[in-house]
């Protein structure tokens, strides 16, 4: 039943009221709106759904949200900036974003010190009228405060946090969980291999994809595996069977790409392990990631997604996603980690960006069970169907400080740190990556870009919960890392501020010991 909610100071239902500050108290299926001070604000209340519009541009509109509702929302549209303080709020929406920000300027959401606030969404079916996220922002978004903010998205197509522009996070304890499925799969489109500047194989109808094999005037339009003739599918299955028979066991005599763990291509097949599984590196099957076939999904349930840049300055951020295509943190224009503790676990890329990813001082644990742990897809790089074909020598990943643990447990060709042949720069910090990788081919620094001595451990056997320790020449322990899964023949990129050129070091773990000398800024250790 529709009810008009009376504010303590003003009565508002589709009429213009005067206020600068607004308090909204949710109570079950009702919401009570209290206004104070004067400004041009229009408030509409329908049950526990509150819509606020303000034409005031010069003042930052201040809102306080408190109480609890299992079927409520806030829709906010102001011409100026706004600040929303969450003060012990528990708000669930049964359809669409419980916090829907239509602002044309930045909105700050503050978790009040000492409070626990939980925002949830259970369905995102009406994508025309409601945006598919717990927090959906049209403009820049700042998440801050000394309290806790829990973001829970259980509905199909529902993301955790989605912004069309930049997202900044600082101080807050932020926990993001998504568990719904995506809304379908897009046909796979192949954009061509990087190469000729005068054309190639662009995407159909897209003249911006100019790389690829030079001279090719045409293009390769998107295709769907279901459209492939049955006889061709049978040929694929026969190829799979022959590979499995030929490559059963060790494949060290088979060659393959230089530096691949195991020296060659491992068997095709289901390569998506659960926690604790032990696998050997290899190509995934034709339906999975890697060379076998990339997937693009409609409304994949990502944790934090921005079409702009994501910057994390401080705070404690935990992100958990669980379904195909659901990347943990995605910033189309880059991601910057300046500080804080960040823990991301995803079946897809844990951290993904369409531009440079910078690590300047945070403690970051990025873990993927089915793809790369950290994946930067800048302009240029390797296999441009997944990026752009404009060649660009700007760094894809820069590590200046902090701790970066990037762990992919799926096997080759997925990596801990993946930048597709674009430059990877290491200037400082502690790094330990885990992944099947592609050896020395794409995602390692050079002697020029390794400002801090760095090694690539090729073929280290990662065993679940077994400590990996690094010692200097005097047997002094430098660092210890424990991985929560097993992976045979990992290609692990490792650096530490204690590493010095000319120094000798030893890596030890159960069943593995390797001593090496840092004769160059970047050293591959087999």
Predicted features by range, described:
Residues 10-18:
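Hydrophobic h-region of N-terminal signal peptides that target proteins for export
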Residues 8-9, 246:
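A periodicity- and composition-biased signal for non-globular, repetitive helical segments
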